[in-house]
Amino acid sequence: MLGMAACAQDTKTETITVTNEVFPACDATHPTGQCDAGQICFEAECVDSATLCSPTNLTGACTAGTICFAGGCVLETALCSPTAPTGPCELGSVCVEGMCVATASLCSSSNPTGTCAGDLTCIDGICGTPEVDPCSVHVYTTQPTVVAKTATSQKAVITVDGLQFKDLSGDGALDPYEDWRLLEICRAKDLVSKMSIPEKVGTMSEGSRVGSGTEDGTIPDNVTAAIVEKFERYALIRTGSRTPQQLAVYLNNVQELAETQPWGIPVTITADPIHGFGLSTNNNTGEQSVNPSSVVSPWPYPLGLGAINDPVVTRQYGDTVRREFRAMGFTWQLGPMADIATEPRWARVQNTFGVNAYAVAMHTRECIAGFQGTGVGGLPVGIAATMKHFPGAGADEDGMDSHSYSGRYNVYPGGYFEYHQIAFQAAIDAGVAAVMPCYSIFKDQFEYDPEQLAAGFSATLITDYLKEEMGFTGMVTGDWGTLGHKYNAESIPTPLRAAMWLWAGSHQFGSDRESNFQDAYDLGYITEADIDGAVEKILEMSFKLGLFENPYVDPAAADVRSAANLEAGFIAQKKAIVLLANAAHEQSGNQATKFLPIDGSRYKDANDDSTPQVGEYLDDTNNDGTIKVWFDGVVDRLVADPEKPDDMTSVAGYGEYDYTAAGSATSLPIVQATGLADADIAILRISARKGSYFGLDAGVPLSFDGAFPGQSNDGSIRNSIQDRNRVIDAFRARDGYTDAAGTAIAATNPNLRIVLVMHFDRPGIVKPFINGLTTLDELPGEAGSYPLVSDEANIEQGRGKGVDAFLVEFGAIDRAVLDFVFNQNVPTSPEGYRYGEAVLPMEIPSSDAAVEAQFEDVPADTVNPTYKLGSGSTL
């Protein structure tokens, strides 16, 4: 079933046929030349994009000498074989000594009698020889950096066999858990054997008691108590209030405190994904803002990486996160999300890679490789990745979320449960360090969840399926407050639920009281052996990260928002923009004018004299010899506001932006318009209506003003109505309307062209803006009112009265949007790149009714979507 057919996601290209713009056609001389829409230049010929190898066409065409494998073209000689002993294998398999072997068949804690390489035998999940204890074998030989804060902790660096080790126990001898030459699970077993029950229970907790850092690096008393009295060693940090350098200093001090404790167990610091950012609209003023992290470099959402659909970019993103996290002292991320965004109302689709499970698998694999340092040193220089939310949170009933009781079910009316496992299997094959189960009950999936409990409490899901069938061998960590999300277990006492968590095969709990697990032990629900097994897997991850040798970082070197990182994220922001419409709203036939990119020299030669004249310039819609552009963005200017610098202002080669132009003999000047009334072109930035995954009893509609169908309070509509009104105001300026008193208000600018840019954190229903509205009038007697865009009767059924261009972004500063629409600062890699190569990683439905009728688990299945999965075109 994991081979279920993929949904279509085509790459689209279009030619630009403007007199003074020449793009060479695809041929042997121009192997990256232009082709018709829906085609791409492939080996000097134009071919249909859908015929090429991709995650959506697993048998597509590749260049000579390569074959289509797992959705990508690879050299046949590079596949797993005796001559390529580390080559790729099919999903669910890994290369062992040149042969593809099922991941789940390998020797591990999940399969204690599994397969080992060579002549080795699986002994209790560890490969070795029967006559030698595998936990006594020195498998690592390269000396790592060992750092001890001896002056404070009284823990010394000792020398054994000419090698350095950290005397974490302070006994002057080399204990097995201090010996970095041994397997990590063996070190963990030795350490666990020395710990008390309270120490073990504290280790099982992943909470936020370490705080968010302090300005001067001092450790608050409550943090000291968490480490010293509660024995907590796994902590989530919320960033935002401290600089990277302050965090590095603070966390060094936290590590130094931990080193002073009896076993010297370091603290493993984690964070949620923090590199993406969004656009929001103030529901009172209509003012817009972007909210990138001030601590790390801003990148587009993972959904934007899915739109770019380039594994190189996704690996670069993962590597950037790794380096920036490590520089601050973070060594674990609660990501990436391997969920499939098949339910478009879900509030978290922007944090997935899309709806195509094979594409999501590719991006998940590359992201994990970037996080975990694959190819550059592995976990000792990486951060532990956490695939979530197993076995998939994307099929939420009615688009709700299991953070809330009403959204406790994931449903599969289309029978696509196994489709949602494809990316998780890819993550397991890639060696992902941890997994976070979903809060949800997987409704009626009795084969996988016969207990009908939240995933982390289901032994069938966690042990039988995740570990034994899929081959996962890492640590199972809980989502926040797992014991409180007690769906179908409400009548079970909390200590017994804690026991059920361990019985299922889960290991660590998030933000739950340690006393619940201590009570489970004291009441006899769980044994010390149950606790030991969990703590061993938790500590194994920290040993793999190299923290027991050196958990410290250099604050002076914590150059997190470096120029290189900012530029890489900025380029990705631009590459993720998808162009979905680029033609005048009064288009007729197939010869509509494409007026993007905005350029003072673009014209159509109306009189065949090969000389541009006033009236022929494409972007001078008012024919007055000047192109006036109104930009309604975060900062409503074509020229940077020095009082509001963006992320790129301080980066060499960028500085303050200016998209105005003086003009020349063959080009018109471009100036800032004062508003809609005098603009040739208006660029409006809006945000799709926000979802919510807390406290709602129904899915939030995707339309900008559709009524919330539940009884709880959905505040998103106030913000989205502000954006709706801004679009209608532009329509009214162009087309006129009738006010509440019945007075006809004439158009103030009938030649206005409108570019709509939507921030895509959910697929907002834009059909009313694309097709246009049948009425722009105020409601009789209601001054200042606007027509409902969620009312199908108010929407034109054919296109012609809507916006002139439409594009979506997945996290972009104003400069990224303006670079795109003005076709400036085009990325130079890959060779021949053009803006607009990204395509939609999920469809944009046409109505709330179409969304309600689709199946939550099936990808891209709404009727007559406004834009299909894979839509997009180049400038």
What are these regions (language model features)?
Residues 12-20, 147-148, 596:
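Generic detection of short hydrophobic beta-strand segments and adjacent strand-loop junctions
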Residues 133-875:
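Glycoside hydrolase catalytic-domain context in secreted enzymes
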Residues 14-133:
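Secreted, cysteine-rich disulfide-bonded mini-domains of extracellular proteins
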Residues 11, 19-20, 56, 110, ...:
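Generic cytosolic/nucleocytoplasmic N-terminal low-complexity/intrinsically disordered segments
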